Amino acid sequence: MILGRNLNQIGYVNREVSSSTDGTYLFAQSVLDLISNNHEKGIPVTCIEIPQNFTKLDFSDIEEESKESEVIWSIFQFIKSNRHRLFFFLPNYYFLGSQIESVVEDSKSVITELSIFLDQVGVKETSIILRIGSAYGARRGTMERFCREVMSLGDSAVKKLSVCNDEKPSLFSVTDLLSGVFYSVGLPIVFRFLPHQFNSGGLSTREAYFLAVSTWPGGKVPIFIHSESSEVDENGVSLSPVPSDKLLHRIPTFGLEIDVILDIPSGLEGCIGYLANYISLRPMVINKVGRK
């Protein structure tokens, strides 16, 4: 389904994977169930948020003809035949730039196992979305630590990584990520629309769109994360970084070809609602009046 000019595909952030998912089989089966359910509902992009204290998984030693390998093969075939896009989103408690060694090691372990799983289901490209996390009052130093830890991962894992912007001005804008991460280790930027309204890094929304897209490899459709504010003023300026339950406007693209993940509390219901109603929604007016 083509959702208007240059917006090809849409998905939503799924937060229903439990931190107590027991072992590789149940995790793989939950992924298969989710992508199959999304596909049936006309949603060709699946994004799964990895919860805090996620059960350690081990995909490095899956035996042939085991129930795990059968599910993994089913996911591989499904993704290949349907060209379904699969992403994992790691919130900021997975923190490669942390000053606490155990946090860094736990984060690297989760990233490595997800990368192995993605390799097994045939996903070799950008598919793991990271936030940098706390800046400790020193954004540059934190980004340098983050980049060092990225480069300590295996090449296959690094090729799947991307990084996204934050809403707090003390954290990481698209401007920060461009100079501090993309130019250093080449991770593409996943642009988050609502956080940019509160932490623009001196860029207009249009400028941030174009800069984020420019970080993606040629031939790959960038993935962005979109939500609208739960509170706006009379000029349409966002007053709260908390996302609204549904979208009231069409997702802007500025003529750029992108796929979009909706980050909204209503999840699947909100995504289906957008698919059903986007033609009747108003175009979004990007107001020049906004927050720094």
Where are each of the predicted segments found?
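Charged helix-capping and loop-helix junction motifs
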Residues: 65-70, 143-147, 175-176, 203-210, ...
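N-terminal pre-domain/capping segments
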Residues: 1-86
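A short acidic (Asp/Glu
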Residues: 57-59, 97-99, 141, 173-175, ...
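Active-site acidic/histidine proton-transfer and metal-coordination neighborhood
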Residues: 68-188
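Histidine-acidic metal/acid-base catalytic patches
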Residues: 187, 198-292
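Hydrophobic faces of well-ordered beta-strands that scaffold small-molecule active sites
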Residues: 1-12, 44-48, 86-90, 126-130, ...
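Active-site beta-loop-alpha junctions enriched in small/polar residues
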Residues: 6-10, 51-53, 91-95, 131-135, ...
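Active-site glycine- and acidic-residue-rich loops that bind
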Residues: 25, 164-175, 197-207, 269
